Amino acid sequence: MTTATHNQIVNAIRGKASQIVPKGATVILFGSRARGDAREDSDWDVLILLDKDRITSQDIDDYSYPLRELGWDYNQCINAILYTKRDWDSSISSPFRENVTEDGIRLWG
């Protein structure tokens, strides 16, 4: 994938996030696409931190699914993982959080 295409997809994710996620949310690209060591078939990992008490199935429909659909426009797989900010803040010692903190790129919020 060219740098221009990569940047186009990053900007598309950022744009979609600005349309769909609520005020107070944070959107972070993480994984191989954020680190710059992705293969051609690598997916796009996106973390969405929501400022609410719990994640519901409606949140998945409202925030994860539109990003998955966006990926189809580019023949790419975009996987969004949802956390509440409270749950994220309480997972300080998790390897997942450490990886996102080290490699993640904030796209929105």
Stretches with model-predicted labels:
Residues W44-L49:
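Short beta-strand->loop micro-motif that forms the acidic, two-metal-ion catalytic signature
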Residues M1-I28, R35-E40, D51-G109:
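Catalytic core of pol beta-like nucleotidyltransferases
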